Structure formats: structure tokens, C-alpha cells
């Protein structure tokens, strides 16, 4: 349990003191972590904050428009770097290599924007579970293990580095952020890339973006999972009409958790699972099969890569 009032005071003071008169680039994704960072930084340094949203081409359906609507008042800069990210991932199948590539590209985009604004400090929404998983070798996070050496920023600030996800939500409430942001499901920094087993292609991204949207539509409002997602896990044989199809296999996953360190699979009623499978296979012609993942964390991680 975090003392939100004390934390906010300390975080605002820390950001103000460490940045001095420098301009600060804010990595704003629209999730609760980066949104809390933005609110803290806005209190601390006002117009010296340069909030930037990078469209990596690996975002959820409608995400960029949503970000523009929610955060346009913060002098938000939207950078479309989708081709840059997807081209860099071409031919890469190893999950750690994908994460490293996304992390490096992510930082390079911010370096470019910093040069335009004069910003020398990078602010990130890294939370405690991110650091534990990176330091423990479980998997790297795009804003921790993926950061390349020789970074051009003089400082990288992570004011949420010691908080768990539920504590970040408490701080969001204390800051008066909208409930939509407070209770936003976690979304991985590398985006849909970690929901695609193997090489990331534009076709696969389009498939899994739509499958994720369907999964969220069917589960979020009724069941309030801590996180739910769809992942592209391989190819399988199916039949549509009289035609034999070698199409994608989509795995649906929904879990409950307190802090992301452990998680239990959500017991979704069979009729709901059947509806999700029916919608995904009907609305995405290239999908041949849908399965539901009931593995807890541990031994599995919540995301697939």
C-alpha cells in the first residue's frame, strides 16, 4: 500500500530537482504508468515537458486516435514511426532479439525528437515488476533491457520504478486522472510484437490487432480481467465452407492479478469462449483455429514473448 500523497510530493520534487532547467521528453503511451508519469511531470516542470506518443505500428486498434483525444491538451507530439519499426523487425524471429530491436528503435526515435526540442532528459513509466523481470533474466522490457549503450540523453528518470501496478492505479486516482486511464489494462511496451510468435509482419500484425480488439470487446466490460489478450501462435489446418484452410492459430488469454508478478487464468464461461472463437474465425478469414490459455503465472508469463 502506497501513501499516495507522500509519493506524489516526493516524485514531483525529484523530477523538478533532477531536471533543473532541462527540457524533458516524456514517453507517453496512454497506459496508466506513462499517464501517471505525465501528470507528475506536468506538476513538476509544466511547459518544459515534451510528451511524445510514438505510433510503432504495433499498437491496439484505434489507439492513436484515442491518445490524441485524451492527451491533446498536453501539447502532445505524435510520431508515426510504424514503417521504421516494422522494417527493423523483418526476418527476426527470436523473442529477445525482437525486444532489443524495439527498445533500441524506441530510444532512437526519442533521441531524434529530443534534438528537435532541445530535450536532454528522458522520462519513463518503468515500474517495479518490469525491473524484476529484466534483472532476473525472465525477459527484457523495451524501456529497461532494450535500452542501448551510448544513449544521448543526460538522464533517464523513472519515478514509478519502485511501485507495483495496483499502487500506480492508486496514485492515478489521487492525481484525479480519468477512470478510463486508472483502470486501463496493461499493454506491453513492445506492443503486438510480443503477441506474435516468430517473425513480425504487417499481415500478422493486422490479424492479431483485430483478434485483440474482439477479445477485449467480449471480455473487458463483463468480466473486468486484470489483462486479456490474443496472440498469434502458429499455423494450423481448418475448414471454412468446403475449403480446406491452412490458417493462423490464435490463443486467447485472460488473467486476474494484483501486481503482475503472479496471475491466475480467468474462468470464462464456455458460451463466451465459443462466441470469441466464432467471431475471430468469422471476422478474420485467415484464422483457422482459436484456443484458450489456462496457464497461470508462473510457470508462464502473461504475454507470450
From Swiss-Prot:
GO terms for biological process: asparagine biosynthetic process. It comes from the Archaea. One of its GO terms (molecular function) is asparagine synthase (glutamine-hydrolyzing) activity. It comes from Methanosphaerula palustris (strain ATCC BAA-1556 / DSM 19958 / E1-9c). The gene is guaAB. It holds the Pfam family Asn_synthase. Pathway: Purine metabolism; GMP biosynthesis; GMP from XMP (L-Gln route): step 1/1. Disulfide bonds: none annotated. InterPro entries: Asn_synthase, GMP_synth_C, GMP_synthase_B, GMPS_ATP_PPase_dom, Rossmann-like_a/b/a_fold. This is GMP synthase [glutamine-hydrolyzing] subunit B. It catalyses: XMP + L-glutamine + ATP + H2O = GMP + L-glutamate + AMP + diphosphate + 2 H(+). Its EC number is 6.3.5.2. Keywords: ATP-binding, GMP biosynthesis, Ligase, Nucleotide-binding, Purine biosynthesis. Residues 2-184 form the GMPS ATP-PPase domain. Gene3D superfamilies: 3.30.300.10, HUPs. Heterodimer composed of a glutamine amidotransferase subunit (A) and a GMP-binding subunit (B). One of its GO terms (cellular component) is cytosol. ATP binds at residues 29-35. SUPFAM superfamilies: Adenine nucleotide alpha hydrolases-like (SSF52402), GMP synthetase C-terminal dimerisation domain (SSF54810). HAMAP family: GMP_synthase_B (MF_00345). Catalyzes the synthesis of GMP from XMP.
Amino acid at each position: 500500500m502506497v501513501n499516495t500523497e507522500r509519493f506524489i510530493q516526493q516524485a514531483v520534487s525529484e523530477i523538478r530537482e533532477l531536471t533543473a532547467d532541462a527540457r524533458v521528453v516524456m514517453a507517453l503511451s496512454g497506459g496508466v504508468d506513462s499517464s501517471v508519469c505525465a501528470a507528475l511531470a506536468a506538476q513538476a516542470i509544466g511547459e518544459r515537458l515534451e510528451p511524445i506518443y510514438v505510433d510503432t505500428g504495433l499498437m491496439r486498434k484505434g489507439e492513436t486516435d484515442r491518445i490524441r483525444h485524451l492527451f491533446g491538451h498536453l501539447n502532445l507530439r505524435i510520431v508515426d514511426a510504424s514503417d521504421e519499426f516494422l522494417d527493423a523487425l523483418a526476418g527476426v524471429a527470436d523473442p529477445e532479439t525482437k525486444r532489443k530491436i524495439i527498445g533500441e528503435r524506441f530510444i532512437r526515435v526519442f533521441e531524434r525528437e529530443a534534438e528537435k526540442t532541445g530535450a536532454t532528459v528522458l522520462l519513463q513509466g518503468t515500474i517495479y515488476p518490469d525491473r524484476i523481470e529484466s534483472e532476473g533474466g525472465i525477459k527484457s522490457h523495451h524501456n529497461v533491457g532494450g535500452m542501448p549503450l551510448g544513449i544521448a540523453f543526460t538522464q533517464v528518470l523513472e519515478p514509478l520504478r519502485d511501485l507495483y501496478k495496483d499502487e500506480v492505479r492508486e496514485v492515478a486516482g489521487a492525481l484525479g486522472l480519468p477512470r478510463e486511464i486508472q483502470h486501463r489494462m496493461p499493454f506491453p511496451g513492445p506492443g503486438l510484437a510480443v503477441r506474435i510468435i516468430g517473425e513480425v509482419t504487417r499481415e500478422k500484425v493486422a490479424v492479431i490487432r483485430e483478434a485483440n480488439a474482439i477479445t477485449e470487446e467480449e471480455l473487458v466490460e463483463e468480466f473486468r480481467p486484470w489483462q486479456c489478450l490474443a496472440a498469434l501462435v502458429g499455423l494450423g489446418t481448418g475448414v471454412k465452407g468446403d475449403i480446406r484452410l491452412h490458417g493462423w492459430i490464435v490463443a486467447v488469454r485472460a488473467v486476474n492479478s494484483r501486481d503482475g508478478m503472479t496471475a491466475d487464468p480467468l474462468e470464462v464461461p464456455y458460451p463466451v469462449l465459443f462466441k470469441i472463437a466464432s467471431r475471430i474465425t468469422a471476422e478474420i478469414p485467415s484464422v483457422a483455429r482459436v484456443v484458450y490459455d489456462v496457464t497461470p503465472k508462473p510457470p508462464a508469463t502473461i504475454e507470450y514473448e
